Amino acid sequence: MSYGREDTTIEPDFIEPDAPLAASGGVADNIGGTMQNSGSRGTLDETVLQTLKRDVVEINSRLKQVVYPHFPSFFSPSDDGIGAADNDISANCDLWAPLAFIILYSLFVSHARSLFSSLFVSSWFILLVMALHLRLTKPHQRVSLISYISISGYCLFPQVLNALVSQILLPLAYHIGKQNRWIVRVLSLVKLVVMALCLMWSVAAVSWVTKSKTIIEIYPLALCLFGMAWLSTIL
């Protein structure tokens, strides 16, 4: 039994004449260039050291916006500067720096004891309370709750310095001169002065960047920050 030739012939796929092979090469080149450009902007091909360095630089730049320059201008802030800084900060919020500050604060105050977990949870709770207060007292501002948590977390940087001085540096000086009663009194006075300065710094920063000007807006924030400052002083 024989079959016709057309029964065993497989026709080739039809290729449109207006789709030249060179076009496919151009598309491939474009795709490759796009992938190369996106890969150069990614973080998968960089080392851990480069990633940490980039994160530290970004945290430092946000500290300049939130904390560094605003302490002298607390009593006479500029509305234009506040608006520009607020828009930039609320648009680029992160929780890496607040997490790092809370970990450092808890380590300094607890001395890596079992108190660390309580301080860690309490610090996040304080940040949440501050963020909720800002969100409720400023309903007209288009700032999310996460942004307020991030801003409040950056304002904990002076409290980290307070914990470092009160719990690490001053105790070392105390052990060196503990035989002299005057040195002990001076160190206690220095601890209170450092606590007051860092508390004013934190309150000034969070008030400036969130445009909080009335007592109703500032007092709860100052009370939360005072609790953290007092814990790092007495523990």
Curated annotation (Swiss-Prot):
One cellular component term from this protein's GO annotations in UniProt: Golgi membrane
MF terms in GO: identical protein binding; small GTPase binding
One of the GO BP terms on file: endoplasmic reticulum to Golgi vesicle-mediated transport
Localisation: Golgi apparatus membrane
Keyword Hydrolase applies: no
Record membrane topology: Multi-pass membrane protein
Protein name: Protein YIP4
Species per Swiss-Prot/TrEMBL record: Saccharomyces cerevisiae (strain ATCC 204508 / S288c)
UniProt KW keywords: Golgi apparatus, Membrane, Transmembrane, Transmembrane helix
Function of the molecule: May be involved in proper membrane localization of Rab GTPases.
TM annotation in the entry: 89-109, 114-134, 145-165, 186-206, 215-235
InterPro entries, per database record: Yip1/4-like
Assembly and oligomerization: Interacts with TVP18, TVP23, YIP1 and YIP5. Interacts with SEC4, YPT1, YPT6, YPT7, YPT10, YPT11, YPT31, YPT32 and YPT52; These proteins are all Rab GTPases.
Lineage: Eukaryota, Fungi, Dikarya, Ascomycota, Saccharomycotina
Family: Belongs to the YIP1 family.
